Structures are given as structure tokens and as C-alpha cells.
Swiss-Prot record:
Subunit composition and interactions: Interacts with the Sec translocase complex via SecD. Specifically interacts with transmembrane segments of nascent integral membrane proteins during membrane integration.
TM region(s), chain numbering: 15-35, 321-341, 343-363, 409-429, 506-526
PANTHER family, per database record: CYTOCHROME C OXIDASE ASSEMBLY PROTEIN COX18, MITOCHONDRIAL, OXA1
The name this protein goes by in its record: Membrane protein insertase YidC
Alphabetical list of NCBIfam families matching this protein: PRK01318.2-5 (NF002358), yidC_oxa1_cterm (TIGR03592)
Keywords: Cell inner membrane, Cell membrane, Chaperone, Membrane, Protein transport, Transmembrane, Transmembrane helix, Transport
Native organism taxonomy: Bacteria, Pseudomonadati, Spirochaetota, Spirochaetia, Spirochaetales
GO MF entries: membrane insertase activity
Record's function text: Required for the insertion and/or proper folding and/or complex formation of integral membrane proteins into the membrane. Involved in integration of membrane proteins that insert both dependently and independently of the Sec translocase complex, as well as at least some lipoproteins. Aids folding of multispanning membrane proteins.
Record family assignment: Belongs to the OXA1/ALB3/YidC family. Type 1 subfamily.
BP GO terms, sorted: protein insertion into membrane; protein transport
Species the sequence originates in: Borrelia garinii subsp. bavariensis (strain ATCC BAA-2496 / DSM 23469 / PBi)
Amino acid sequence: MNQSKKILRTVYLSLFLIGLFMLINDIFSSIMLSFKSSDKEVQFDLNKSFDDNEIFLSKSNGFDLINKSQNIVVETEIYFATFSTFRGNLVSLKLKNHLNLEKDPTDLINVDYKNETFFDVSLDYLVEDLFLYKKIDNLNHEFKAYFKNHGKIYEYVKKYTFSEKNEYLMKFTVIVNSLNDYDLFDIDSYKIVFSSEIERLSDKAKLQYNNYLSQIIYYDNKLKYGKDGLSINNPRWIGSSTKYFEVLISRENMEVEFKKERGVLKSFIVNNVGNKKNISDEFFIYAGPKDNRYLDIFDKSGDNTFGLSDIAFGMSVEKSLWYLIQVPMQMVMQVFYDVIPNWGLSIIFLTIVVRILIFPLTFKGFRATAELSKLQPKMKELQVKFKHDPKKLNEEMGRLYKEEGVNPLGGCFPVILQLPIFFALYSLVNNLFLLRGASFIPGWIDDLSIGDSVYNFGYRLYFVSWTDIRILPFIMMFTQLGSTIVSSNLDLKNLGAQQKFLYFGMPIMFFFILYNMPSGLLIYWITTNIFTILQQYYIKMHLS
């Protein structure tokens, strides 16, 4: 077996592992978003479901009486929250500090509230009516309605409490009181329907962001994925997660059921009632970045407004197999960013540091390849001499390697040992929340979490799924070709078709594979290629 075939197999193995890694990363990290809205009109009638208007008015002190559906907009330090007096639900929740591609606050709620809502309480029947509204203060808001069930009158309150600090958390309280000291209506439990569609995206953003949705649940100290028909008792929390944002819900002693309706997977939170005269249940909702800086503060009671502890929201951020390698890498990136506040430069500097640290492996692999190159004349003689006797050829090749003190796989192991570092860097740059919206070169690379763009088509090209003309993929391809040529000592005249494909076809294939990848990842790749070219020149000079 000659040297070129060994190199070919090594490269194929590396590419296979890289492709497998990227495939597994896509499959297990996400489920593609799918949602259909409706324009169905909803008619409102203040007296529709309540017969005794005198009781209705006497109980409304401090609440606003509104005879038509109205949106209530609340602004906090971190949210623009919009509530509807129809059913008293939250219909929009925008993050003030995290903008979308249109430079508007990102809206985490993606539902058509005329027909279904983000977080809907389902009692014996759904109270489809207008609610009274009361603003206690800027952080506390209540919605109240009254309904009859089997001739008995009940007060129904939904209370929303925002955090005093800049925490992406709110408390949602469900209160149902019997006004005539009745036992609660004849049910053992009630449900909260959690619509799993989050992060409302514009058409442009849908074309740009590779945005996926996962239904997640944390149970028995393990992160699991929701699926149709799944039922779990007493999970720590449930939620919906996209690449950069998530909504997580926690409450003690709840049961969760997952059910697919109209193609959308929904979560049903089942809450036991028993023989009580009232309901007063609290739910804590995290709605914000998928970032441990904001998630982990709810593990210690002294670190958050509501005094929560051991919620484990931070476990929603999956740890890759290379997590132990990623942690120091991110720390190094942060150090560079603190000195020069530009995440693009931080990626470049981190890549250079990593390449310097693994230089001994690179040098060892190149030297092993050079030693094999010196044996090429003798290897060709043996191949000609024993071309009809493969067994004898292998024996003589083995004897030659032993006599010359050369390991034929010496150039392969250093390459394979570098793969975990590549995987760790890939995961870090591809998923780091800090890169979302981070500009490298204004006007060209405005967001390191998506591809660069010099021209947007406004639609997706059918065959290649391109939405923009991008420059970085071309730079990546040409630097990859340069790195391949410099590293391989190519004799173009003597290359076979298979080798030509390996050396020239692979960079072109990666051009199409990585075309829509985040620009931060391509900056890492380009920096690696350029550093490799300079590194190989140095090694050749040293060995000569």
C-alpha cells in the first residue's frame, strides 16, 4: 500500500468523522420549526358567560372595566410584555436587549392569540371571556374574571410578577376562589397548555437563521426531549428551546404530557386540585437567552429575586462531548475580548493560540510524511517487483519500514488526535450566544452567528439553498486549496484522478457545505488555513 493511499484513507476517515459530528450535532440539537396561523375573527360579549352583572361590578374595585378586547403593554428593564384582556394571557414578550435582523427587539412568543395562546389555563372549560385588568405596580399585573359552573360562582385570577432585577424570570400565579364557600368544581386537576412555538421570526430572519426548535424536559437529573405521547411525573422543569433563546417553566409537583396537535407538539402541565375550595398555584417562567450567565443564577437563593434554588435551568444548555476542552477555549476568547472588544478578533487570536499549542503534533505528522516520501523510490520498486503477489508485497513493505525505522501511520495519528480540538472549536463558535449580533467588520460581517452578506436575494435559491452572496466561503475555499497544495508537495503532472479529487474536489465540496454556516465558524476555518500555510513553510525550511 503506497503512501498516497494511506494519506487518502486518513483524510477520508477525518472527513467522515467531521461529517458524522456535524450530522449528529444537527439531529440531536433541534427539531425544525413549523407553525400555521389563522385569521379567524373572535367576537367578544361582556355578558356572554356571566348572568349576574351586579356581582360582576361589585367585585371590580381597582380593576379596569373594558368592554372589548384590548392589549396592555408593560415595559420593564429587559422586557416589552403585551397582555390581552381576552382570556388575560401574555401574547407578546420582547427582549429589549436582544435585537433581531430588523434591529427590533426579539419576540419570544410565536402564537396567534385569537385562537390559541402561549400559556393557557384550562379549567373545567376554557374561560373564553374578557378579563378585568389591574396594575398593582410596574412589576405586578392582575387579570380577573368570574364564571359559573353548575350554578356556582367562582373568581378566576391570573397574576404576573416580573423580577425586580434584570433577571429573565417572571412568576405566574393561578388563583380560583369559590365565592359562596363551595367546594371547587368537580375536577381532580386542571391543565396549562404551553404552546411550544417560541421566537417569532420575520421572513428575512427565517431565511438567514438556521433556527430550530426543541421541546425539552429536565427529569431525574437528565435532559430529555419531548415527543408525542410522552408523560412524566414531577419533572424539574419543561420548556422550548431554539439555538439562542428558550422558555422554561418550573413548578413543584406537576405532571407533564406531550401531545401533537395540528402538527405542533404541545406540552400540557397537569396540576392536581383535590377537594379544595380554592386554587393558588405558582409557576416560574424563564424567558430569555440560552446562556448560562443568566440561567445559573437560579441555583442559589441569594442570587435571584424570587429566592429560587436548585432549579437547574442551566442544564438546558447541552454540554458537548468536548465540553472540557471548550471551557478553557471560551475563557481564552473572553480574555482577548476584554482587551480588544471584538469577537471576530477573539476567534482569530484563539485559533492562533490553539494552532501554536498543537504545533508539536503538526510537526510530528509532517516529519513522518516527509520520511515516507524519502522511501517512495524503494516502495515503487517493490510495487513493480511484487505487483502480482500482494501478500509478498505487504511483507516486503513491512520489512522496509522496519529497516528504515519509519511508521507508515506516523502521519495519521497526529491528524486524528487534532480532531477533538476541531470539534470543540466548531461547537464553541457555532453555538456561543455571545456571538449572536456581534459585529466583526461593520457593513460586511455584522453578525458572527449567521453568514456574511454583500447582497441579499430576498428568497432562497432552490438547488443550493442560498439566500445571499457571501464572500467568506470563497476565501475559505481558496485558502483551503492553498493549504492543501503547500502541505502536500504536489506534483500536478503525476496526480491520478482520485488524488486530484481529494486535493481540489474536497475544498470545493466544503465550499458548498459551509456556505450558509455562521461567519464566526468560517473566520476560524480561514485563520486555520492561513496559519497552516505559514506553518508548513516554516516546517519545510526547518527540515531542509
